[in-house]
């Protein structure tokens, strides 16, 4: 196992070896103040998740960024399991690309894991000048030792799905990963699978469209994404565009963790479905819808029909289970994907959402539920918002969940989330029969933060997790 290997690099030799890794004791997650009314910088929170610790389920450290209104969002590592064979590499820095300001913060989490400190700031001017890219999202480490970050647009806020390359040691901006002029029309997330010489990227919308909130008219105008882009991994060129039937706003994308696998899943937020992409015999790629969450007919909401809004998806390291969150409907789901063409629902839990009893929304017609779910109260705190970002323990038995999506959309869809702050919850997972159960003893209430209620987002463990590492 990698942790006992004197000559190995970061992470684990395989996803199945990673499942035997140590239990997580810390979680790092960005907390956002943009759009909350609190004039304070976003910060990286460190949460103690060791049940034996006296500080269990508490924020034990906060690292504020030096600027206001960055909109920290996702994070990634300087190096990970893609460099397992290189003993000169070690996972020491967490990179925090900013969705709005386009800064990249490099945080040292190795010197003192319980009290991270800022190592370097990559300013947007350098990224604009060298890449003509902006509005940064997903960060993945590469086997080359570089770090690759996806962009949603150009510095003027137009759609542009390109990729920034940073040196993994100095964090200097090296330029774009894609060939000059070869960016996709829009961008968001990406995942690569070198054994099949492929990368696939997704798209949200142009920054100018989504920055200040959601306008349904923009959907009608075709301004939101519904494509996957297939790239030649070695040539850095876009080779195929897949149009997603019913697949509006494809966000998070996950190949199966097995590096030999030639298929994976993407969650389509507004389409409220999961689509499977796969390689054909001729080497091209196709996509098919495998799960559809039906909308609910409602009264008292901005539209007469409420989509579930699938905002995050995750695969267990053994590729047995798919998890996803329905941010508006309020449920988190577990599917058995032993047969990836026919996912089977085996677990479901409601964690707030827009259709709870006693709320402003009345459900008129529901293809799935007989009655509206009860509001979620944990340790006396009524949970605002719905389940959003998720992270799974390496062994697959614990899910961590946060409730904020993106500050401008939080403000629009869940105003109480802005007033009361988001939460972090922990769900126990049955990996034998399937099933999800809330841990009633775990709650991190970001409504009680020292500077005011904060919006906590993506979750990371110090040693890598189920969405940070890619195996070769």
Curated annotation (Swiss-Prot):
The modification Phosphoserine is found at residue 467. It catalyses: methanethiol + O2 + H2O = hydrogen sulfide + formaldehyde + H2O2 + H(+). Interacts with USP33. Keywords: Acetylation, Cytoplasm, Membrane, Nucleus, Oxidoreductase, Phosphoprotein, Protein transport, Selenium, Transport. GO terms for molecular function: methanethiol oxidase activity; selenium binding. The N-terminus is blocked. Pathway: Organosulfur degradation. The keyword Nuclease does not apply. Pfam families: SBP56. Catalyzes the oxidation of methanethiol, an organosulfur compound known to be produced in substantial amounts by gut bacteria. Selenium-binding protein which may be involved in the sensing of reactive xenobiotics in the cytoplasm. May be involved in intra-Golgi protein transport. It comes from Bos taurus (Bovine). Belongs to the selenium-binding protein family. This is Methanethiol oxidase. One of its GO terms (cellular component) is nucleus. Its EC number is 1.8.3.4. It is a peripheral membrane protein. It is found in: Nucleus; Cytoplasm, Cytosol; Membrane. The keyword Phosphoprotein applies. The gene is SELENBP1.
């Amino acid at each position: 196992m990698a942790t006992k290997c004197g000559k190995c690099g970061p992470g684990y030799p395989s996803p199945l070896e990673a499942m035997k890794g140590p239990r997580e004791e810390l979680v790092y997650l960005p907390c956002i103040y943009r759009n909350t009314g609190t004039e304070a910088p976003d910060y990286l929170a460190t949460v103690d998740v060791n049940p034996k610790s006296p500080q269990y389920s508490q924020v034990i450290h906060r690292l504020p960024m030096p600027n206001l209104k960055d909109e920290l969002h996702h994070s990634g590592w300087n190096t990970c399991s893609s460099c397992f064979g290189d003993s000169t590499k070690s996972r020491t820095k967490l990179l925090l690309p900013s969705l709005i300001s386009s800064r990249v913060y490099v945080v040292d989490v190795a010197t003192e894991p319980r009290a991270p400190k800022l190592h370097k700031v990559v300013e947007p001017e350098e990224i604009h000048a060298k890449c003509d890219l902006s509005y940064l999202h997903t960060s993945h480490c590469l086997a080359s030792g570089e770090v690759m970050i996806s962009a949603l647009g150009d510095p003027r806020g137009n759609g542009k799905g390109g990729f920034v390359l940073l040196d993994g040691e100095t964090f200097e901006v090296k330029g774009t990963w894609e060939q000059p002029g070869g960016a996709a029309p829009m961008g968001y997330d990406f995942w690569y699978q070198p054994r099949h010489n492929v990368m696939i990227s997704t798209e949200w919308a142009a920054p100018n469209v989504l920055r200040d909130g959601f306008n349904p008219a923009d959907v009608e105008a075709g301004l939101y994404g519904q494509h996957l882009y297939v790239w030649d991994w070695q040539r850095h060129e876009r080779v195929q565009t897949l149009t997603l039937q019913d697949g509006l706003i494809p966000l998070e994308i996950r190949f199966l963790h097995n590096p030999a696998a030639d298929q994976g899943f993407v969650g389509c937020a507004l389409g409220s479905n999961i689509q499977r992409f796969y390689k054909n015999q001729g080497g091209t790629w196709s996509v098919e819808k495998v799960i559809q969450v039906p909308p609910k007919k409602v009264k008292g909401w901005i539209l007469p029909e409420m989509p579930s809004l699938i905002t995050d998806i995750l695969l267990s390291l053994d590729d047995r289970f798919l998890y996803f969150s329905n941010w508006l409907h309020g449920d988190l789901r577990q599917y058995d994907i032993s047969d990836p063409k026919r996912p089977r629902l085996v677990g479901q839990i409601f964690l707030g959402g827009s259709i709870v009893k006693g709320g402003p929304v009345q459900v008129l017609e529901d293809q799935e539920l007989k009655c509206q779910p009860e509001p979620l109260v944990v340790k006396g705190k009524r949970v605002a918002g719905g389940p959003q970002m998720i992270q799974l323990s390496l062994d697959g038995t614990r899910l961590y969940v946060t409730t904020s999506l993106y500050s401008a959309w939080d403000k629009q869809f869940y105003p109480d989330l802005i007033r009361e702050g988001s939460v972090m919850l922990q769900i126990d997972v049955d990996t034998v029969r399937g099933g999800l159960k809330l841990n009633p003893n775990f709650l991190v209430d970001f409504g009680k933060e020292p500077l005011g209620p904060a919006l906590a987002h993506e979750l990371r463990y110090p040693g890598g997790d189920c969405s940070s590492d890619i195996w070769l």
